[in-house]
């Protein structure tokens, strides 16, 4: 069966038209052999050589240089380590500490709006309040 297929292909090859290079006709342009790009440029040769070496070693075309892989691996490990530390810091806080932080934040929020209102108040009102405080302090000192 295989030999029959080979015979058929050989017969087809004989039927195909071949250019007649033997006949010399001055009007015809002789075909030139195409240049192999691998042999044509030095950079292409080096690229081809590198690809062959990578193929022999079993490396893919998409693989990165070793230094770049190591740097990415370190960055990834640092990010993972940082995230783990943050999660552990949150877990290690006891409920008492968490409640203290919440109360501290609430107190800070409650203290901030009056300061803002005082900043927007006219100066004569601020001076008047300062005078009242001083007056109350001096009266308390007199009582003592």
Curated annotation (Swiss-Prot):
Query: Would I find tRNA processing among this entry's keywords?
Result: no
Return any one Pfam family short name: DUF1151
Q: Which superkingdom heads the taxonomic lineage of this protein's source?
A: Eukaryota
Could you tell me which residues belong to the region Disordered? 105-124
- Which keywords fit this entry according to its UniProt record? Actin-binding, Cell cycle, Cell junction, Cell membrane, Cell projection, Coiled coil, Cytoplasm, Cytoskeleton, Growth regulation, Membrane, Nucleus, Stress response, Synapse
Which ranges of the sequence are coiled-coil? 66-112
Q: Does the keyword Signal apply?
A: no
Q: Spell out the molecular function terms from Gene Ontology.
A: actin binding
Q: From the UniProt record, give one GO term of the biological process aspect.
A: cognition
Q: In which tissues is it expressed?
A: Widely expressed. Expressed in neurons. Expressed in malignant glial tumors. Expression is reduced or absent in a number of cancer cell lines.
Give start-end ranges for motif Nuclear localization signal.
Answer: 74-84
Identify the InterPro entries for this entry: FAM107 (IPR009533)
What would changing residue 15 to M do, according to UniProt? In ovarian cancer and renal cell carcinoma cell lines
Q: Give the signal sequence positions.
A: none
Where in or outside the cell it occurs: the entry states: Nucleus; Cytoplasm, Cytoskeleton, Stress fiber; Cell junction, Focal adhesion; Cell projection, Ruffle membrane
Q: Where is the composition biased (Basic and acidic residues)?
A: 112-124
UniProt main location, coarse: nucleus
Subunit text: Interacts with ACTB. Interacts with COMMD1; this interaction stabilizes COMMD1 in the nucleus. Interacts with MAP1A. Interacts with PRDX1. Interacts with F-actin.
What does this protein do, in the record's words? Answer: Stress-inducible actin-binding protein that plays a role in synaptic and cognitive functions by modulating actin filamentous (F-actin) dynamics. Mediates polymerization of globular actin to F-actin. Also binds to, stabilizes and bundles F-actin. Involved in synaptic function by regulating neurite outgrowth in an actin-dependent manner and for the acquisition of hippocampus-dependent cognitive function, such as learning and long-term memory.
What protein family is recorded?
A: Belongs to the FAM107 family.
Could you tell me which PANTHER family the record lists for this protein? ACTIN-ASSOCIATED PROTEIN FAM107A (PTHR16768:SF3), DOWN REGULATED IN RENAL CARCINOMA 1/TU3A (PTHR16768)
Q: What is this protein called?
A: Actin-associated protein FAM107A
Q: Which gene encodes it?
A: FAM107A
């Amino acid at each position: 069966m295989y030999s029959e297929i080979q015979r058929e292909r050989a017969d087809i090859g004989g039927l195909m038209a071949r250019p007649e290079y033997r006949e010399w006709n001055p009007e015809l342009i002789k075909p030139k052999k195409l240049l192999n790009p691998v042999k044509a440029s030095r950079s292409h040769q080096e690229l081809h050589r590198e690809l062959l070496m990578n193929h022999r070693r079993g490396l893919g075309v998409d693989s990165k240089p070793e230094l770049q892989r190591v740097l990415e691996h370190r960055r990834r490990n640092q990010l993972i380590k940082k995230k783990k530390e943050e999660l552990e810091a949150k877990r290690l806080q006891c409920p008492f500490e968490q409640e203290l932080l919440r109360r501290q934040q609430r107190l800070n929020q409650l203290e901030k709006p009056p300061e803002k209102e005082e900043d927007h108040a006219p100066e004569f009102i601020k001076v008047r309040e300062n005078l009242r405080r001083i007056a109350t302090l001096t009266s308390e000192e007199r009582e003592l």
